[in-house]
């Protein structure tokens, strides 16, 4: 499972 914080950091990166 991926942590919400990681998803936010990646999304943000994009």
Curated annotation (Swiss-Prot):
Assigned keywords, A-Z: Chloroplast, Membrane, Photosynthesis, Photosystem I, Plastid, Thylakoid, Transmembrane
A GO cellular-component term linked to this record: photosystem I
An example Gene Ontology biological process: photosynthesis
Membrane topology: Multi-pass membrane protein
Keyword Metal-binding: no
Keyword set includes Oxidoreductase: no
Major location category of this protein: plastid
Subcellular location: Plastid, Chloroplast thylakoid membrane
Function per UniProt: Not yet known.
The family this protein is said to belong to: Belongs to the PsaG/PsaK family.
The protein's name: Photosystem I reaction center subunit V
Organism from which the protein derives: Cucumis sativus
Lineage: Eukaryota, Viridiplantae, Streptophyta, Embryophyta, Tracheophyta
Gene this protein is translated from: PSAG
